[in-house]
Curated annotation (Swiss-Prot):
<keyword id="KW-0997">Cell inner membrane</keyword>
<dbReference type="Pfam" id="PF02508">
    <property type="entry name" value="Rnf-Nqr"/>
</dbReference>
<comment type="subunit">
    <text>The complex is composed of six subunits: RsxA, RsxB, RsxC, RsxD, RsxE and RsxG.</text>
</comment>
<keyword id="KW-1278">Translocase</keyword>
<comment type="similarity">
    <text>Belongs to the NqrDE/RnfAE family.</text>
</comment>
<protein>
    <recommendedName>
        <fullName>Ion-translocating oxidoreductase complex subunit E</fullName>
        <ecNumber>7.-.-.-</ecNumber>
    </recommendedName>
</protein>
<feature type="transmembrane region" description="Helical">
    <location>
        <begin position="182"/>
        <end position="202"/>
    </location>
</feature>
<dbReference type="GO" id="GO:0005886">
    <property type="term" value="C:plasma membrane"/>
</dbReference>
<dbReference type="InterPro" id="IPR010968">
    <property type="entry name" value="RnfE"/>
</dbReference>
<keyword id="KW-0812">Transmembrane</keyword>
<feature type="transmembrane region" description="Helical">
    <location>
        <begin position="125"/>
        <end position="145"/>
    </location>
</feature>
<keyword id="KW-1003">Cell membrane</keyword>
<feature type="transmembrane region" description="Helical">
    <location>
        <begin position="63"/>
        <end position="83"/>
    </location>
</feature>
<keyword id="KW-0249">Electron transport</keyword>
<feature type="transmembrane region" description="Helical">
    <location>
        <begin position="39"/>
        <end position="59"/>
    </location>
</feature>
<keyword id="KW-1133">Transmembrane helix</keyword>
<keyword id="KW-0813">Transport</keyword>
Length: 231
């Protein structure tokens, strides 16, 4: 149970692929102009990570070490092609919005890195969980960045959600404030870099505060009964 918890915590927070490893920044910065696009690409990446980790882990004993990387790439490319066809069939609007960034999941360092670092060494169930956790960590980072950029740039949230979830999702659109023209700095790549920088700073501050609390709690437990540590 502790190993499962560690895999989940590492993927979602401690070893977050976007905020700690800083991998996959090209799609992270390019696609997160809206929350819907960010969520769509994040979920697609999560599905690819889960399936490729599961497949590579299952075949790890029959994969020659000398040619393992080309085999990993072929497996990843096959899964990405299947996911791309699914999005094309059931979410065509999202497919058009994401464009080239769906097939580019094949070259995403996150996917290849988890295959080599984790799936090739662990069992199928734990590898699938690792892929899901890493993918959801990246999805959360994309979604937060996409939401911030959409709110600041357009004053809306979940605009175009029907392209991802169907016609019923039109009711999810929220207009936070009205604007006649978008704030282009937030919608263009410079806004993505600024937003990512703020998220990195926020995560650092949260980690430092949590570390300080753990240190204070450990110091209090180490004191003899009746002492407060104050001079």
């Amino acid at each position: 149970m502790s190993e499962i918890k560690d895999v989940i915590v590492q993927g979602l927070w401690k070893n977050n692929s976007a905020l700690v490893q800083l991998l996959g920044l090209c799609p992270l910065l390019a696609v997160t102009s809206t929350a819907t696009n960010a969520l769509g690409l994040g979920l697609a990446t999560t599905l690819v990570l889960t399936l490729t980790n599961l497949t590579i882990s299952t075949l790890r004993h029959w994969t020659p070490a000398e040619i393992r990387i080309p085999i990993y790439v072929m497996i990843i490319a096959s899964v990405v092609s299947a996911v791309q066809m699914l999005i094309n069939a059931y979410a065509f609007g999202l497919y058009q919005s994401l464009g080239i960034f769906i097939p580019l999941i094949v070259t995403n360092c996150i996917v290849v890195g988890r295959a080599e670092a984790f799936a090739a060494k662990k069992g199928p169930a734990l590898s699938a969980l690792d892929g899901f956790s890493i993918g959801m960590g990246a999805t959360c980072a994309m979604f937060v960045l996409g939401s911030l950029r959409e709110i600041i740039g357009n004053g809306t949230l979940f605009d175009g959600a029907d392209a991802l979830l169907g016609s019923w999702a039109k009711v999810l659109r929220v207009e936070i404030f009205h604007t006649d023209s978008p704030f282009l700095l937030a919608m263009l790549p410079p806004g993505a870099f600024i937003g990512l920088g703020l998220m990195l700073a926020g995560k650092y501050l949260i980690d430092e505060r949590m570390k300080k609390r753990r240190t204070e709690a450990a110091a209090e437990r180490a004191l003899p009964n009746g002492e407060t540590g104050n001079v």
